[in-house]
Amino acid sequence: LALWELLGDPVDGLRWAGALLRAHGEVLPVSRVPLTIGGDVLSAGPDGRLRTRCVEGQVALAVAAFEGRVTDVRLSPSDAPATPEALSAIELADWVVLGPGSLYTSVLPHLLMPEVRSALAATTARRLMVLNLRTGDQETTGLAHADHLKVLRSYAPDLRLDVVIADVDAVTDRAAVEAEAARMGARVAFSRVSSAQDPQVHDPLRLAVAIDEAMTH
């Protein structure tokens, strides 16, 4: 944050931070405009009846999700311009990887920006999505793995995928996942990508191998 304030630009700030840390690769913000994630959460009221309430802010949305299920997500402002650097990176990429991460607060927000969504649909890069290991977290209660793809398609109907990586043990609805992936133009690569110590966490090495194999086959 100090570098951003000193240089007056988040892209320059992140580049300086990367140089200081001698980091490989580059982190780019999708917009120079501060964005707020908001959403609708369906939960039971004091009388037991279901109601939908609007929540603003990523932390508030995550907390509210403990009490119900996220049914919609949005960005404010909705017309924030994307950074040219991010759009150029998408255009020039060989592969674009989506996930893993919280569906509504980590994966979908990028697709809510029209310019980014259009760039992802238009790029000549191949597209890969890593499905989450768990489907029953607070954000996605009641959603199966196939539903994650269905939600993604509902927000970005023009987005095509080439490969979906799914954990061989975590996914129980294989046929449904394959059907949803096929609707987006993708094949499913089933692989053991969870940690041997904690099956709810991705193993970095296993996931790296699975991604490498998906990209080379």
PLM regions with names:
Residues A60-E67, S76-T83, A89-E91, L103-R160, ...:
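Conserved phosphate- and dinucleotide-binding cores of soluble alpha/beta proteins
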Residues V97-G99, L128-V130, I165:
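Structural motif
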